[in-house]
Amino acid sequence: MLIPRKVKHRKQHHPGRTGHATGGTVVSFGEYGIQALTPAYVTNRQIESARIAMTRHVKRGGNVYINIFPDRPLTKKPAETRMGSGKGSVEWWVANVKPGRVLFELSGVDEATAREALTRAIHKLPLKARIIKREEGDA
């Protein structure tokens, strides 16, 4: 699971999900990628589930690149607890994904295999996404 090794503050305010991604919007490491179309919090378990779905489909053929990291803690209070008495304990680590952000990249496989693997990964994620191909001029 992806979680930060060490954080300065254990609990944070919830980040806003408005606006579009400013960086990480092009495929830079692989040949194909998953680009978010809607904003969402993606948990570390969802990232791991999508990664496993891709790697199992491509077997030993390709390389999978993860471009997001769950660096935000989300807290939750226990069930049937009275209001007050502080903020709840950390339950999940999430990545704040905005539209336009490339989440995963894939290289080393043919286009049909890549599209199927990325489609399987999209089904594991809590957002709408599309598959994009690397442009010639991209870094």
From Swiss-Prot:
SUPFAM superfamilies: Ribosomal protein L16p/L10e. Residues 1-24 are annotated as: Disordered. InterPro entries: Ribosomal_uL16 (IPR047873), Ribosomal_uL16_bact-type (IPR000114), Ribosomal_uL16_CS (IPR020798), Ribosomal_uL16_dom (IPR016180), Ribosomal_uL16_sf (IPR036920). Residues 1-17 have a biased composition (Basic residues). Keywords: Ribonucleoprotein, Ribosomal protein, RNA-binding, rRNA-binding, tRNA-binding. GO terms for molecular function: rRNA binding; structural constituent of ribosome; tRNA binding. It comes from the Bacteria. Binds 23S rRNA and is also seen to make contacts with the A and possibly P site tRNAs. Belongs to the universal ribosomal protein uL16 family. This is Large ribosomal subunit protein uL16. It comes from Clavibacter michiganensis subsp. michiganensis (strain NCPPB 382).
